[in-house]
Amino acid sequence: MNRADIKADKTFDITVADHKFILPSEKMIINTNDKVMFNVTSKDLTYGFGLFREDNTMMFQMQVLPGHNNDILWHFESPGVYTIRSTEYSGPKGIGMIEKNVVEVID
């Protein structure tokens, strides 16, 4: 299967700058079985973009490099609430890069 042939049901554009995630909305709502593209742009440093389950296990992650196209396509197969965290060391402020319960997958 070629990724270029897969059409995303939803796309979320996220910016990262000064150790903060700038989200497109307060909560990103996704329907079960949607394929979602997360486009993440860094304005300054290399960051990580990870999605974590409620039990703190990681669902996926990618590095976010400034000046590059950073995206991930994910198929959400079941409902849940997820937290975004930076998964890359970006200095002492990076430990606070957590956006709790901002992704929700619904039936």
What do these predicted ranges mean?
Residues 2, 31-33, 39, 56, ...:
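Detector for Asparagine
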Residues 13-15, 37-39, 102-104:
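Soluble periplasmic/extracytoplasmic beta-strand elements of cell-envelope proteins
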Residues 4-35:
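N-terminal edge beta-strand
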Residues 18, 40-44, 53-55, 78, ...:
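A mature extracytoplasmic/lumenal domain signature
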Residues 23, 29-53, 79-81:
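Extracytosolic and intramembrane catalytic regions of membrane-associated proteins
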Residues 41, 45-66, 94:
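Histidine- and aromatic-enriched segments that form or immediately flank copper-ligand environments
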